Amino acid sequence: MTNIHNHKILILDFGSQYTQLIARRVREIGVYCELWAWDVTEEQIREFAPTGIILSGSPESTTEENSPRAPEYVFNAGVPVLGVCYGMQTMAMQLGGLTETSDHREFGYASVSLENSTALFANLNDNLTASEPKLDVWMSHGDKVTRLPQNFQVTGTTPTCPIAAMSDESRRFYGVQFHPEVTHTKKGLELLTNFVVNICGCETKWTAENIIEDAVARIKEQVGDDEVILGLSGGVDSSVVALLLHRAIGKNLHCVFVDNGLLRLHEGDQVMEMFGDKFGLNITRVDAESRFLGELAGVSDPEAKRKIIGKVFVDVFDDESKKLTNVKWLAQGTIYPDVIESAASKTGKAHVIKSHHNVGGLPDYMKLGLVEPLRELFKDEVRKIGLALGLPAEMINRHPFPGPGLGVRVLGEVKKEYCDLLRRADAIFIEELRNSGWYEKTSQAFSVFLPVKSVGVMGDGRKYDWVISLRAVETIDFMTAHWAHLPYDLLGKVSNRIINEVNGISRVVYDISGKPPATIEWE
């Protein structure tokens, strides 16, 4: 079996918003990497045994007295090191160079003139001006290196940053003041490939097929002949976990699908058809609609609704697990960003620390071992693996759906009548987006039920019925988002169909709020 962890890159995180992007780019190249807080110990690095190390950017300033530094062992480990932005600055300072606050901060596009040959820039240039190679890059820095450490040479300059890149070829230490991980740096992926593959010597074995083979082998080794229970929602993460476990242990996997009455139109039937009929999984459907709606009756506060939905799910799931007397393991769809966010750094600078719903959220009364086959994977990697396992692209690329489902898309109190109206309206909206080619152009689109009545005219009569708001956004990272400029004729068609086909809706509006100030979901 291929050892997909044999060659690996260690990324030390100094707090940059782009650090996870570095990891995703390295994985994209085909090499395993892990992202750790900057204040790791020499012992931890030795134990991990990286093939190369990347130092990330940071919002901190190297000129501040207590700003973070790389462990000294990084520069004595005998492996190549790449410093990015702040990472380059701390490398320079720790090896005897100097950094200062710049009079001219650089934020945005810049053109770096390449000087002196370096393995990092081999075969890279975006344009040749008077035979001088240049790279189009993305800068984001207020400090700059003003004196090189011993044995370093300048390999890149800009008019306002004389040392925009540096290298010590003998020790294989490299620094770039720009961000190769962002797409705005045109040759960024090629630069990272030069470092990871050509300089560090990593083999590109991190592929979907190899990851599946490794995951199946590890599941078999972990659980043996034991039985495993999984809460299967039909979302991408739990679906991929289900198929990996099914491949590894077959009927020893027990999938529990909790139908909470807060799902999209026909979603429960689709989950059963897909995983029960098509893939032949051992799956139980629990109709818990009345239990969820009963607990939600009279509750209108969004946070209270979320907590109730979470608690009832755990209770229902636990009731099912008690029926399975031989189960020893609980499978979860925890992915790598969950692990990163929940990792407790000593300083708190490296990551936002928060309790994630998939990490550490288990009730005390479920004393089962944890199986987490996706805990090393980013979301885009989970999708690739899902496709390789045979999940349909339409399902893999479906827009995000909140954990509490329609519980947070019905504003205020949740009632079955409201959910049924919303389901049908939303299905029409999504159907028309797909038919017009706009579903793939938007990052997330959905309908919201507004608990207000509006007057409408149907035939000769007036009626007071409910209002639906349509929401569609375009975003790269879901941290910020723009409302999607859907064509008027498309919006008109959706509105007309909803009002005519969904009895109980008299008005349809379109939400044109960006994030910020508004959030993507209404609740």
UniProtKB/Swiss-Prot annotation:
Per the UniProt entry, the Enzyme Commission number(s) are 6.3.5.2
Q: May I have one GO cellular component term? A: cytosol
**What does the record give as the reaction this protein catalyses?**
XMP + L-glutamine + ATP + H2O = GMP + L-glutamate + AMP + diphosphate + 2 H(+)
MF terms from GO for this chain are: ATP binding; GMP synthase activity
Coiled-coil blocks: none
Catalytic residues?
C85 (nucleophile), H179, E181
Q: List residues of the GMPS ATP-PPase domain.
A: 206-398
Classify the source by domain of life: Bacteria
Which parts of the sequence bind ATP?
S233, G234, G235, V236, D237, S238, S239
Q: Which UniProt keywords apply?
A: ATP-binding, Glutamine amidotransferase, GMP biosynthesis, Ligase, Nucleotide-binding, Purine biosynthesis
Domain Glutamine amidotransferase type-1 span(s) in chain numbering: 8-205
Which top EC class is given?
ligase
Biological or metabolic pathway of the protein: Purine metabolism; GMP biosynthesis; GMP from XMP (L-Gln route): step 1/1
Assembly description: Homodimer.
Q: So what does this one do? A: Catalyzes the synthesis of GMP from XMP.
Please report the name of this protein according to its UniProt entry.
Answer: GMP synthase [glutamine-hydrolyzing]
Source organism = Haemophilus influenzae (strain PittEE)
Name the gene for this chain.
Answer: guaA
